[in-house]
């Protein structure tokens, strides 16, 4: 998005312009600002962004409406089965992304039947614990807080990462080429993140969940386990706003990591594409 000027006689006329790609075409939209750039240009820019995303927001709202309609029709027993299935798939994928050796079927055996495969005990315990934290998370309708995030982390890792479980780091960390913020800044960074998460009327919840996930991973508040907590946080926001959740699949981990290593806007575009690819298909089925 950029501000440009055009000459009209001796006068300059200012416009706010945005170009984006749609398929193979480049679409350009613009609005007239006046003979000078208004003082409230930031507000105008945000309103312009929202107007450009009108179709997107309508589609996301349709996904939410269809999901809620279907969910309300389901008997409680069917809902519980569905949540257990989501728990299995989500737990398998989120742990596999972080290097777990547990397969999808082994995750099912652990979660449903309490049967432990011949795999590292750490992976078995983290599968069991993550599933329980996820299902308990869905029962919570409260605001996001440091206490909540620390509890999730502690409950998942208190038997496998005892020295760091349930605590924010107090030492520097590096993830590949990325150097996380100084640990002394974590308190303030997390306060800003949590305040944004809980702010009312804070734009579309699907976009918010992506932004919060991205910023959480950049803060990297824990010594380890940030990806799993970040993906729980992402789905907590979606679920409590009435939207279907999103599973970042292990098979798509490369594009996911690539998006996380980019800037926030690029990650948001990636996230929205994935969300619409998964839930947009279900949206189309309801029309047929």
Where are these regions (language model features)?
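FIC/Doc superfamily catalytic core
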Residues: 1-224, 228-288
